[in-house]
């Protein structure tokens, strides 16, 4: 019964209003409040601050600064194996495997469309049909910056509006096409392994998604918006392997897509496997 009530609440709650309220709280600079809230959060979720560039919880100007904290140099060494594909984030593998019939596996009995995930653009989604995907879930305690799995040149970014369902095992198993319904930002890169998509998926109380080249992505009007970066008028944006791509102000999920016959996921990785940014999660297939 508790599970059914939780799922029902996901459909009834005012997602965007709650996220705006969470954003206001997370940006609050009232010293006693932000210190107390940050300390409670760190204790509640057992956040390891020993690897943070700034270990003192009270030194952050607001909760979001703590949540998107930088790590010390060397805290996340990059796998130096030639051709290695890196985990884009700290977290746990939600699912990974082949893209079959244009769909990505979500949980038992559920999948979602690559076409819908990328905003309904057939030309954008076509290179990934028959390819491979990995979904990484970032829990509240994790480092919340997202990094490049491979070096790449940005070709396109798409903001796709949507709901903001909570993202966890329960919703993955009970909300159809969860990741293709939530608000998200899809980033398409040209890499040594062909096109690569990194999709940052929002969730309830995720106040915003940022990228290093555009800052806050959420447009004033919540409508689908495409930003092209392969035009002559724009300077190319190239990011090296392991470079920061973006960040969640409060957490969620990163999904990585590759085209057919490009990568082979590490055999030891299964649903639930913990991963760290910079860890090798795949090798070139050919």
Swiss-Prot record:
Is synthesized initially as an inactive proenzyme. Formation of the active enzyme involves a self-maturation process in which the active site pyruvoyl group is generated from an internal serine residue via an autocatalytic post-translational modification. Two non-identical subunits are generated from the proenzyme in this reaction, and the pyruvate is formed at the N-terminus of the alpha chain, which is derived from the carboxyl end of the proenzyme. One of its GO terms (cellular component) is plasma membrane. The record marks 251-252 as: Cleavage (non-hydrolytic). The active site is at 90 (charge relay system), 147 (charge relay system), 252 (charge relay system), 252 (schiff-base intermediate with substrate). Pathway: Phospholipid metabolism; phosphatidylethanolamine biosynthesis; phosphatidylethanolamine from CDP-diacylglycerol: step 2/2. It is a peripheral membrane protein. Binds 1 pyruvoyl group covalently per subunit. It catalyses: a 1,2-diacyl-sn-glycero-3-phospho-L-serine + H(+) = a 1,2-diacyl-sn-glycero-3-phosphoethanolamine + CO2. The modification Pyruvic acid (Ser) is found at residue 252. Its cofactor is pyruvate. Keywords: Cell membrane, Decarboxylase, Lipid biosynthesis, Lipid metabolism, Lyase, Membrane, Phospholipid biosynthesis, Phospholipid metabolism, Pyruvate, Zymogen. Its EC number is 4.1.1.65. GO terms for molecular function: phosphatidylserine decarboxylase activity. GO terms for biological process: phosphatidylethanolamine biosynthetic process. It is found in: Cell membrane. Belongs to the phosphatidylserine decarboxylase family. PSD-B subfamily. Prokaryotic type I sub-subfamily. Heterodimer of a large membrane-associated beta subunit and a small pyruvoyl-containing alpha subunit. Catalyzes the formation of phosphatidylethanolamine (PtdEtn) from phosphatidylserine (PtdSer). This is Phosphatidylserine decarboxylase proenzyme. It comes from Pseudomonas fluorescens (strain SBW25).
């Amino acid at each position: 019964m508790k599970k059914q009530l939780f799922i029902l609440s996901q459909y009834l709650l005012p997602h965007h209003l709650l996220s705006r309220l969470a954003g206001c709280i997370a940006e609050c600079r009232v010293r006693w409040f932000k210190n107390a809230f940050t300390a409670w959060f760190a204790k509640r979720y057992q956040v390891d601050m020993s690897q943070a560039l700034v270990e003192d919880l009270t030194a952050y100007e607001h909760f979001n600064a703590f949540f998107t904290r930088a790590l010390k140099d060397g805290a996340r060494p990059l796998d130096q194996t030639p051709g290695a594909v890196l985990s884009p984030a700290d977290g746990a593998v939600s699912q990974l495997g082949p893209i079959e019939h244009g769909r990505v596996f979500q949980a038992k009995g559920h999948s979602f469309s690559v076409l819908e995930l990328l905003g309904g653009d057939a030309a954008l989604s076509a290179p990934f049909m028959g390819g491979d995907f990995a979904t990484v879930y970032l829990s509240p305690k994790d480092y919340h910056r997202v990094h490049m799995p491979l070096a790449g040149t940005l070709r396109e970014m798409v903001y796709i509006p949507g709901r903001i369902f909570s993202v966890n095992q329960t919703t993955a198993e009970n909300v159809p096409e969860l990741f293709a319904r939530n608000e998200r930002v899809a980033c398409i890169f040209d890499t040594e392994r062909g096109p690569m998509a990194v999709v940052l998926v929002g969730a309830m109380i995720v106040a915003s998604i940022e990228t290093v080249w555009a800052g806050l992505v959420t447009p004033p009007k919540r409508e689908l918006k495409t930003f092209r970066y392969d035009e002559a008028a724009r300077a190319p944006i190239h990011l090296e392997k392991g470079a920061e791509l973006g960040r969640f102000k409060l957490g969620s999920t990163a999904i990585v897509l590759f085209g057919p016959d490009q990568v082979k996921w590490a055999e030891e990785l299964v649903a639930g496997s913990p991963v760290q940014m910079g860890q090798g999660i795949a090798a070139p297939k050919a």
